[in-house]
Amino acid sequence: AGLAVCEDLGLVPDLAVGDFDTFGLERMEELRKKEGWATDVHKPEKDETDTDLAVRSALRAGFRTAHVLGATGGRLDHELSNIHLMRAAKDAGLFMEIYDAKNRIFLLTPDDEEHSVFRKTDLYGKYVSFLPLTEKVLGITLDGFKYPLHNKDISILENPSLCVSNEVPGESAKISFREGILI
């Protein structure tokens, strides 16, 4: 699915990984020869998803950031797996961002200063949401957001939607928290 998105948007990948069952191997090979990008082709019968294999290939190739397209394309099981895969990628040293037509999804940890500031000019849409990936996220402070928070805890079980659909009314806003993982 990701390669089809690249083709639709006129993007050239650095590396395309998967079984290419939905895109087609012949079509993939034609594009690869024309545009000169690398591939890592796998059989359709495997224990990992294409995205999991892509993360492993990106790590082996020394990438530090992965922009993943086609990871939210209609199957909830794959979408949730890909969101959880962001944690494994981050633990291995790869910052993974998932893009689709309406969303830019990435993982935040308390020590991630680089991705904790949200500049209005860099936003992917109007809204910014923070969802707990761990059972609890402690001490969330939202400065500069339309709906600020100060040292608030959120939990998957108690208030998982507290930080959904916030906005950045000024030039920038910042999030900080003590413990947990957010997407």
Region spans (language model):
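Acidic/Gly/His-enriched mid-domain segments of enzyme catalytic cores or analogous surface patches
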Residues: 2-91
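Structural motif
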Residues: 14-15, 37-39, 65-67, 95-97, ...
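A short acidic, often aromatic-flanked loop/helix-cap motif at beta-alpha or helix-coil junctions
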Residues: 45-49, 104-106, 155
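Generic secondary-structure signature for well-ordered alpha-helical cores
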Residues: 60, 88-94, 135, 152, ...
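Generic secondary-structure microfeatures
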Residues: 70-73, 100-102, 134
